Amino acid sequence: MEESKELQGFYKIFRTVVYVSVLLEFFEYAIDPAMLDHWGGILTDIHGRIKQWMIYHDGNLVYSKIATVLLICITCVGTRNKKHLEFNARRQVVYPLTSGLLLLVLSVWLFGHTMETRLYTLPLNIILYMIASIAGVVLVHIALDNISKFIKEGLMKDRFNFENESFEQCEEKVENEYSVNIPMRYYYKGKFRKGWISVSNCFRGTWVVGTPGSGKTFSIIEPFIRQHSAKGFAMVVYDYKFPTLATKLYYHYKKNEKLGRVPQGCKFNMINFVDVEYSRRVNPIQAKYINNLAAASETAETLLESLQKGKKEGGGGSDQFFQTSAVNFLAACIYFFVNYEREPYDANGKPLYAERQQDPQTKFWKPTGIVRDREGGNIVEPAYWLGKYSDMPHILSFLNESYQTIFEVLETDNEVAPLLGPFQTAFKNKAMEQLEGMIGTLRVYTSRLATKESYWIFHRDGDDFDLKVSDPKNPSYLLIANDPEMESIIGALNALILNRLVTRVNTGQGKNIPVSIIVDELPTLYFHKIDRLIGTARSNKVSVTLGFQNLPQLEADYGKVGMQKIITTVGNVVSGSARAKETLEWLSNDIFGKVVQVKKGVTIDRDKTSINLNENMDNLVPASKISDMATGWICGQTARDFVKTKTGMGGSMNIQESEEFKTTKFFCKTDFDMAEIKKEEAAYVPLPKFYTFKSREERERILYKNFVQVGQDVKEMIKDVQNKRNAK
């Protein structure tokens, strides 16, 4: 306080000097020296001595004014006024300063223009000159003094804390043979800088979250399609709103095929259960995809869970019993049809001859394992085996038969028979309620899948391509289409395809072609055990990209445990604008976390203003900032690869500059070449039709004929099995 009083006294002295200089100016210029001839000439002598000073020496009034203004400036430099939060620079500085300077100029003009009118021996122009000088000095003093009331520390300047929450991001394009690189721009230290989002290890999985219209498909999904296609990946793309992504995928397939970038011999395939003209036919229920009972059980579980999507969790022990029973029963049916009268085929689909012997218990003929060429009779190794009715349509039709008929047929297979014990016991004891609980629910669900279109596409006679799309000998692109109006039914059928496809591509000991599996709108498709695929498929070069809108949506269809498995297994995380609380908290707290931020505090009292700077940990990107992102803005984090640790002398390390500790987080706006994208969209070509029908009526007739034929096949099979049983 003592120092403050001394300084205040010092400032008062300077203020006094300012106005003393004004009085001295009046003394020198406004008063006639002849009027000072009093007291023995003392005043005249003082006047003469002051006249010798530099600012008064040549009688130029301008120098005196300049000196006064300089004194005001020096005085105001040390002024400590109380700060004003609502500081108005125009009203408090500009206007009074301008007025004051104009009055000082006016005073000089008035001094040089003589007026005859006098007041108390002083000419009127001198009186006006003095008034203008005093008013001008006061206004200039007030204006410059008010500058000190301005809070220079930028209070309220960064209202939304943009500076503290901005950070330096990757500006270097990190590219390799598998990477996806997305150009972007980000704000940091007053500049909108250019940079790159480099997903250098896509095999660790990527998920993209964002509300509808946030730009997640345009910003992330489409670049993955574009760049992975150009880098020779086999592609599997799920198109919820066919043909939105289908046209893009086909365009890049044709483009890169011409440029020689797609794998050699790569074909383009689509699965579409609505417009079957645009669909290949595929049979996921056959021995090359289901080679044991465990695979049949997993296929059954996938199909049932996709039909019951969102209803898996929350049941008690009895619910779990009925769920497991339904899976076992469907698995028994699948495995029976896979093996029923199966025949060997070579790689070209040509039938071979399999030697058989009669089973002494069932009296059915079973393959011995020896396969011969039909032409030369030479022993050969078959490429695959195919059951006589090994497909999903025949299984769905078979499930509509009576319980007694089903049990009589299934128990003829020794491998399947053990699974039938609980069902046969319930049937023999006439516990029909229990049996309906075990099987009836399954039949209700699967009956929804029995459509003409599904029977056509899944029929064994139309197996157009292999689901191992990453096979170097027979690679392919696969577009899996859905329709919002039939989402649940088509989603279950697509889940069956995807389940068997994933099993195939996740083999090969690293010799496969890299494959990119892209599923936008993930909750509309049940992706069975997706966390295991992401966690184990890196060695087989399987890239998985998943898009959804928010975590509660994912939880509703996959359950809480399933959701946690997905979001915690994936390495690359990207988000557009989000709204759900769970999503925002996950991103803000677990992905971005907290960083050290400098917080500035200003304390204003009547005597002084204090500025405090504090360091504390706070959210790098708060939830409110993520929810407020505009379309095209994305944030997230990419997975790190191994980086060799570099140290200096004695193991020293500058951790702030070390490559190993640089952040891979980003908060930015995508920066695509829109002209190039529009040019690409203008070059899209029509999607191919794989089957041609003369008319819609002909298509319906062919599909219906196939539908009826499946039912007849099942009836014939049952009759044949029963005849063989009776022959025993």
Q: Which ranges hold each PLM region?
A:
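Conserved ATP-driven motor cores of ASCE-family P-loop NTPases powering translocation/secretion/packaging/pilus
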Residues: I534-T536, N540-S543, G547-T638, K724
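P-loop NTPase motor domains
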Residues: E25, S148, K152-M156, V199-V542, ...
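Hydrophobic alpha-helical segments involved in membrane association or supramolecular assembly
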Residues: G100, G491-N499, N572, M617
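N-terminal structured subdomain of primase-like DNA metabolism proteins
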Residues: E28, M649-G651
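C-terminal nuclease/phosphodiesterase catalytic domains that cleave nucleic-acid phosphodiester bonds
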Residues: N616, T647-G648
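Basic- and hydrophobic-enriched, low-structure N-terminal and domain-boundary segments
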Residues: M1-S214, F218, P223, K231, ...
